[in-house]
Structure formats: structure tokens, C-alpha cells
A protein has these predicted regions:
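Non-catalytic scaffold segments within catalytic domains of secreted glycoside hydrolases
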Residues: 1-154
Length: 154
């Protein structure tokens, strides 16, 4: 599973301080969007341990989804997936045996720490009616899966 990186710097006496790059975009969870971190950790682990086949079983982002006119135009989530899928591709090109990638999550759901407040899904769920609507990110993910090629971001 990979969602973001965390970088800490020592500040003396065994204390540490979390370092955050404010120039990066952030998710609704307050996490940096840093796809290069996924490439970096895969390459580092493969160099150190010679990894067996790898499956990325969870990768996704809670974003500020707005349901309007029967649609959710979540371009920030599309960009998140494009960046992270490219990161996986980059690691594979450099020798990591990656066999699978799974977006988190198919549908907006109950998150153990956030309840229904944060939406990770590529399918929007109206919690009152249970109506489901495929988000723009769901359509983009479908297109990637069917073509096995990343669309270039605008």
C-alpha cells in the first residue's frame, strides 16, 4: 500500500520534525501528493532485498468531490492516479517485478478513522439514497485499464 511519503528531520536530542513540501498538492487527508515516493521506495526495497513479484494493493486519495448535474469531475484524483501509475511504470522499467495495481477505493465507503467524511472512491455514493455514480476518475481508470496506456494530462 502507498498513499504518500513522510519525511522527518532531526532537530537534536533525538527529537524529530516532520518536513512537508508546501509546493506540492495535498489530499483531503492532508497528505502530500508525491508519486516519486512510490518509485523511490520500490527501487530502494528492490535494491536492498531483491523483491518477489509486487502487487500495489492500495493506492488512492481522498479529494474534495462535488456532485453536480449527475457527475463528479474529480480531476485532482485523475492527476493523482496518473502520477502514481507513471511511478509504478517507472519502477517496472527499472527492474521491479510489478504484477498488479489496485486503486483505493472502488466506491466511497466508511473509513475506519474518518467515517463517511472522506471520499476515496472512483464511484460516488450518495449515502442517503445509495445511488452510485461513476466519477470522472472512474472513467479515466477504466480507460487506462482497457488501453494499458496513461492519458496525457491537459
Amino acid at each position: 500500500n502507498y498513499y504518500t511519503r513522510e519525511v522527518y528531520e532531526g532537530v537534536g536530542n533525538n527529537d524529530r520534525h516532520k518536513w512537508v513540501d508546501e509546493s506540492l498538492p495535498f489530499t483531503e487527508m492532508g497528505w502530500e501528493v508525491y508519486p516519486q515516493g512510490l518509485t523511490d521506495i520500490l527501487l530502494q526495497l528492490n535494491k536492498q532485498y531483491t523483491l518477489p513479484p509486487v502487487y500495489i494493493t492500495e493506492n488512492g486519495a481522498a479529494m474534495a468531490d462535488t456532485y453536480a448535474d449527475g457527475q463528479v469531475q474529480d480531476t485532482d484524483r485523475i492527476e493523482y492516479f496518473q502520477g502514481h501509475l507513471q511511478a509504478v511504470s517507472d519502477a517496472a522499467e527499472q527492474g521491479v517485478d510489478i504484477r498488479g495495481y489496485f486503486a483505493w477505493s472502488l466506491m466511497d465507503n466508511f473509513e475506519w478513522a474518518e467515517g463517511y467524511e472522506k471520499r476515496f472512491g472512483i464511484v460516488y455514493v450518495d449515502y442517503e439514497t445509495q445511488q452510485r455514480t461513476i466519477k470522472a476518475s472512474g472513467l479515466a481508470y477504466r480507460d487506462f485499464i482497457s488501453s494499458r496506456h496513461l492519458a496525457k494530462s491537459a
